[in-house]
Amino acid sequence: IEDNGLFRLYYRGSANNPLGNDRHTQDNPMTVCYAESRDGVNWTRPNLGLVEFRGSKDNNILWMGQEALAFAPFLDTNPAAPASERFKATAATVIPGRKQYALVGFVSPDGKRWTKIGDHSIIPDDTTNVFDSQNVSFWDPTRNKYVTFYRAQKSGTRWTKFAESADFAHWPKESIQWFDYLGAPLEQLYTCAARPYPRAPHIYVGFPNRYQPHRTSPQQPGPDMNKGINDAVFMSSRDGVHWDRRFLESFLRPGRDPLNWTDRNNYVAAGLLQTGPDEISVYFNQNYRSPTAHLRRGVLRLDGMVSVSAGYRGGEFVTKPFTFTGDTLSLNFETSAAGSIRLELQDQHGNPISGYELETFPPLWGDHIDHVVTWTANPRWGTSLKKLEGTPIRLRVVLRDADLYSLQFRQAEPAKP
């Protein structure tokens, strides 16, 4: 979680579990632990002094007990949220008299001292609810509501449900919908790690874990361990229900470490952090159930989850008609030394707009995160596209040995005096 220049990390802790699995004892309870960082790279574990563990409060534990199983916090950006509830969280727990897990809510003024908001499930009961892994929630300013993605089971397959609510403590049953993967192959996907992408918050990006239950690695440590191996994939959505999985390949592979080829590894943490002007950090677990269990940081270029890519022989695409707000167009791209990107603006019927034809656009080459483009036929307009603002257009993009990661129409920054 990014909070005014401070990065906060929450993780489930365990201490020298002799069983080597998820069985917790009185001497080895489930805990929620806390770390923080100013750069997302170097992390400290502050002494919180909140929870007694083995006779001492000198630790970074902020919660102990069943709720630590799937404790998932977020910074509440709802402008109406009181200061005492600046942070919120969900967690799976067992409520007396219930056979299945319930999803309960928590609030906190500082992200460290947490209060449970009752022993009721904030999600209506349903026999398909599971909740036993990370359930992601957040305030969505584009909807003006809270959104949650939580684990469920559909015909024996791990699945995820969507719900939305104006009240974090109560989620209406009529808002609940199953994820729709739009015809993608049926796979065991859960812990979706999905949140709005910070640079385009109207788009959700997710990194669900993909579980292969019938594959067992030789490194699988003992008969008490769960079978299966895991990796992570990428998906995106504009409404939180319909998810685009056109990229079916693994986003995060287990790699060469044999201890990453056991179950419950390669889970991506919810929340991408921008840790530099041109990079995003993504965090994931490795060596689960092993004494060397740890979190690892991976780095992507800004907007670098996927790209439109063309080889040396080249390729092109044309968008659907759209309108834009702003007066400049910026590209995030890279090419080879021999590669290039060229653009053309067309009217909604596919006809080139005078002055914005492909032949008037100088080929772009290089590696840029934020490159404002111009057409040579329009020197008097410079980079301005103001005359086309609000008009339906198409964008034609021609690539050769190049990758286009993102494009953005925006208002040009005022000239410095």
Model-derived features: positions:
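Carbohydrate-active catalytic/glycan-binding domains of CAZyme proteins
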Residues: I1-P417
